[in-house]
């Protein structure tokens, strides 16, 4: 699969995840927030809790499943990016936080299995 096709599939998976989370009552704060240490796919608000959501998509699990791709190294990058986000967006700095993962396997939007893991890891 070419890079642009993979990027498009990733964007579709993120849009699918965002719609799902909004239907669950979460509100979007930021999408694709970039910093020198990485990117936060979705920053959401669940009640008064700031939720950093990593969206992982795999068309098939031949190279490992979507959830398995959020290894310790990726978790460290997400925690660092979240810390930088909270330093930048100080309005959220005193709110409780958690890290969720949305793992999607198959074709996004076509009844693809979506697995939402709340509090997938700790900082």
Swiss-Prot record:
Q: Which Gene3D superfamilies match?
A: 3.40.1350.10
The organism's place on the tree of life at top rank: Bacteria
Signal peptide location = none
Q: Read off the CDD domains from this record.
A: PoNe_Nuclease
Q: Which InterPro entries match?
A: Restrct_endonuc-II-like, tRNA_endonuc-like_dom_sf, UPF0102_YraN-like
Gene Ontology molecular functions: nucleic acid binding
| Classification via HAMAP family | UPF0102
The record, for NCBIfam families, names: PRK12497.1-3, YraN family protein
Can you tell me which family this protein belongs to?
A: Belongs to the UPF0102 family.
Q: What is this protein called?
A: UPF0102 protein Psyr_4114
Read off the lineage from the record: Bacteria, Pseudomonadati, Pseudomonadota, Gammaproteobacteria, Pseudomonadales
């Amino acid at each position: 699969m070419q890079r642009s096709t993979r990027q498009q599939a990733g964007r579709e998976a993120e849009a699918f995840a965002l719609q799902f989370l909004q239907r669950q009552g979460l509100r979007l704060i930021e999408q694709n927030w970039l910093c020198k240490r990485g990117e936060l796919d979705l920053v959401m608000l669940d009640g008064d809790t700031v939720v950093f959501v990593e969206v992982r998509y795999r068309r098939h699990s031949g190279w490992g499943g979507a959830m398995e791709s959020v290894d310790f190294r990726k978790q460290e990058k997400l925690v660092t990016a979240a810390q930088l986000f909270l330093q930048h967006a100080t309005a959220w700095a005193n709110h409780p936080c958690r890290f969720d993962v949305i793992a999607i396997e198959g074709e996004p939007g076509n009844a693809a299995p979506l697995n939402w893991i709340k509090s997938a890891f700790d900082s």
